[in-house]
Curated annotation (Swiss-Prot):
Gene behind this protein: gcvH
Annotated PROSITE patterns: BIOTINYL_LIPOYL, LIPOYL
Residue intervals of the Lipoyl-binding domain: 29-110
Protein name per Swiss-Prot or TrEMBL: Probable glycine cleavage system H protein
Highest taxon of source: Archaea
């Protein structure tokens, strides 16, 4: 884990400038979540509108919305693909994203252009540097 001030950055993940992370699993699917920075900036989460299983998304498309006490924020797809699973525990317990944003993923995607799109994402070290610049 890399620490940048009060924020934690988990190594082995890919990150976007919008503070989503992507984890490539051994079977080639991708888990998507939000970073520690994102959950701290949002504050206490009240609701996660999960995407529909079967939804096709392109990199940068809105994957879902998260409501906090401060605002409603959009979560963008870090890679293109089909939503094949969602973390249903978040429907009843959105605060799981506050408690551990790296263990509590939002959706699992079957990617369609993974190799190319991973090149456009940041590794943990690059994301930590990005956070230092904010």
């Amino acid at each position: 884990m890399i620490e940048v001030g009060e924020y934690k950055v988990k190594e082995g993940l890919y990150y976007t400038k919008d503070h989503e992370w992507a984890q490539v699993l051994d079977d080639g699917t991708v888990l998507v979540g939000i970073s520690d920075y994102a959950q701290k900036e949002l504050g206490d989460l009240a609701y996660v509108e999960l995407p529909e299983v079967g939804k096709e998304v392109s990199k940068g498309d809105v994957l879902c919305e998260i409501e906090s006490v401060k605002a409603v924020s959009e979560v963008y797809a870090p890679v293109s693909g089909e939503v094949i699973e969602v973390n249903e525990a978040l429907e009843d317990s959105p605060e799981l994203l506050n408690e551990d944003p790296y263990e509590n993923w939002i959706a699992k995607l079957k990617p369609t252009n993974l190799e190319e799109e991973l090149k456009e994402l940041m590794d943990a070290q690059a994301y930590a540097e990005y956070l230092r610049s904010l």
